[in-house]
C-alpha cells in the first residue's frame, strides 16, 4: 500500500494571529514556487488555538494546498471545563488533524496514556484525525528500553480504537531527547522504532491496518536531514517544530521528495 507522507508543522506556543497569517501566506507562496505536488506529500500546519481561524481564512480563501489542525483537544464534549476546547469546536473550525499526547503535554501537564486514549477517541468521534505522539526520554534510550517503552505507550493509546479507525490515523514517534535540542536520532534510530510501532499495530490488529497507518518521526527535523529520514521504509512523514516557523525551511521539508 502506498502511504502519502504527512509533513506537519507544530507551531507550539508561538506566533500571534497576525504573525500566523503572515507565515501561512509565505508558506503558500514558498510551496507554489517549489512546484509542490500534494500527491507526493501532505502539508499540514498545527497553530495555537487563537490562530486557527485566521489561518483557516487564508488557506480557504487563497485555496492553499495546506491542511490545518489543533495542538490539543478536551476529553469532554462540553460543560464547566474552563480553558478546555472541545472536538466539536475544532471540527466546526475545519480542523482536519489534532495532536494528542505530545511529549510536552505528557511532561508539563501530566497527561497519562489513559487520557491520551480518551482524547484520541474524541478526535475520531468528531470526524478528525488524531496524530498520536509517543517516544522515550534520554534515560530510557540509554537503558536500551526505547522500543519497549514506545510500543507500550502506543498499545495503551490505541486501546479500544477499532482497526478501521487506526488505519486512518497518524502516529508520531518523537524521541524526547531530540526535541528542540539540536540532537537528532539517526535515520536508522527512527526506522528502528517506527518499524517496531508498525509491528505492534500488526500484532494488535492485522497486517492491512499496519500497512495503512502513517508513522511520522519528530525530533529536530530540518531541510538538511529530512531526505535521509524519509528514505526509511517505515517513516511516513515528519512532525516538525522549530523549522516549521520559517516558511522557506518548512517548504523544503514538505518537498523533501525533490532532494
UniProtKB/Swiss-Prot annotation:
Substrate binds at residues 10-12, 180, 220, 241-242. The active site is at residues 102, 174. Gene3D superfamilies: Aldolase class I. The keyword Isomerase applies. The keyword RNA-binding does not apply. Keywords: Cytoplasm, Gluconeogenesis, Glycolysis, Isomerase. Disulfide bonds: none annotated. GO terms for biological process: gluconeogenesis; glyceraldehyde-3-phosphate biosynthetic process; glycerol catabolic process; glycolytic process. Its EC number is 5.3.1.1. GO terms for molecular function: triose-phosphate isomerase activity. One of its GO terms (cellular component) is cytosol. It catalyses: D-glyceraldehyde 3-phosphate = dihydroxyacetone phosphate. Pathway: Carbohydrate biosynthesis; gluconeogenesis; Carbohydrate degradation; glycolysis; D-glyceraldehyde 3-phosphate from glycerone phosphate: step 1/1. It is found in: Cytoplasm. Transmembrane segments: none annotated. Belongs to the triosephosphate isomerase family. HAMAP family: TIM_B (MF_00147_B). Homodimer. Involved in the gluconeogenesis. Catalyzes stereospecifically the conversion of dihydroxyacetone phosphate (DHAP) to D-glyceraldehyde-3-phosphate (G3P). This is Triosephosphate isomerase.
Amino acid at each position: 500500500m502506498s502511504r502519502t507522507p504527512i509533513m506537519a508543522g507544530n507551531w507550539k506556543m508561538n506566533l500571534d494571529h497576525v504573525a500566523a497569517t503572515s507565515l501561512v501566506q509565505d508558506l503558500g507562496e514558498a510551496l507554489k514556487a517549489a512546484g509542490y505536488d500534494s500527491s507526493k506529500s501532505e502539508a499540514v500546519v498545527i497553530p495555537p488555538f487563537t490562530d486557527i481561524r485566521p489561518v483557516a481564512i487564508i488557506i480557504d480563501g487563497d485555496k492553499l494546498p495546506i491542511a490545518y489542525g489543533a495542538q490539543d483537544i478536551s476529553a469532554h464534549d462540553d460543560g464547566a471545563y474552563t480553558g478546555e476546547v472541545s472536538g466539536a469546536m475544532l471540527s466546526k473550525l475545519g480542523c482536519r488533524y489534532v495532536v494528542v499526547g505530545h511529549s510536552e503535554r505528557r511532561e508539563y501537564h501530566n497527561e497519562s496514556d489513559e487520557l491520551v486514549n480518551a482524547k484520541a477517541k474524541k478526535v475520531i468521534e468528531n470526524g478528525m484525525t488524531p496524530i498520536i505522539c509517543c517516544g522515550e526520554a534520554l534515560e530510557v534510550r540509554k537503558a536500551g528500553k526505547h522500543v519497549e517503552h514506545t510500543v507500550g505507550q502506543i498499545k495503551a493509546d490505541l486501546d479500544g480504537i477499532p482497526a478501521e479507525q487506526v488505519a486512518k490515523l497518524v502516529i508520531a514517534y518523537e524521541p524526547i531527547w531530540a526535541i528542540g535540542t539540536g540532537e537528532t536520532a539517526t535515520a536508522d534510530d527512527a526506522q528502528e522504532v517506527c518499524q517496531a510501532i508498525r509491528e505492534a499495530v500488526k500484532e494488535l490488529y492485522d497486517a492491512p491496518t499496519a500497512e495503512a497507518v502513517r508513522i511520522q518521526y519528530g525530533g529536530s527535523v530540518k531541510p538538511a536531514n529530512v531526505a535521509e529520514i524519509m528514505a526509511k521504509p517505515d517513516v511516513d512523514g515528519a512532525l516538525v517544530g522549530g523549522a516549521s516557523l520559517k516558511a522557506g525551511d518548512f517548504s523544503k521539508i514538505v518537498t523533501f521528495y525533490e532532494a
